[in-house]
A protein has these predicted regions:
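A metal-dependent, Asp-based hydrolase signature
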Residues: 1-40
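C-terminal cap/substrate-recognition subdomain and adjoining C-terminal extension
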Residues: 28-140
Length: 140
């Protein structure tokens, strides 16, 4: 599955980067966040030790993190030069990569998600919350 998702994404990004309607992928990302940054929920107030853990690509979410002042991002990765997907951060990969980067004994105080597929991360957290729209429900 990872191979298929990676190849599909690579093909899409390669075509997008060659499009005459797009100045650059980076500009497309900037334009996207100029338009949608305001949709980040107001309840989220970044802290210095926050980690954004997502299956989305560093290419896109990295810009949101920069604007939010969040320095810690664990995301799927794309080599911008080749548009090849180098890492997919989903399912059990999230917990594995998180532990690789932050250590096996790091404590997660609070974990927020919109997906039950994040159960491995929920299990690692002291407190966990499911987010749906503007509703936040504690699940652990």
């Amino acid at each position: 599955m990872e191979y298929g998702v990676g190849k599909m994404t690579e093909g899409y990004l390669t075509e997008l980067s060659r499009s005459k309607r797009v100045a650059s992928v980076e500009q497309l990302v900037d334009d996207f966040w100029d338009r949608y940054y305001g949709r980040i929920k107001p309840w989220y107030q970044p802290e210095s030790d926050d980690v954004i853990l997502t299956a989305s690509f560093d290419l896109t979410v990295g810009e949101a993190c920069r604007r939010l002042g969040v320095r810690n991002l664990v995301a799927s990765e794309v080599d911008v030069g080749t548009m090849k997907v180098t890492y997919l951060n989903f399912s059990t990969n999230k917990a594995k990569r998180f532990r690789e980067l932050y250590g096996p004994d790091v404590v997660i105080d609070e974990f927020y998600t919109d997906s039950k597929f994040d159960q491995p991360m929920i299990d690692m957290a002291r407190h966990a919350f499911m987010v749906k729209g503007n509703t936040i429900t504690q699940v652990k």
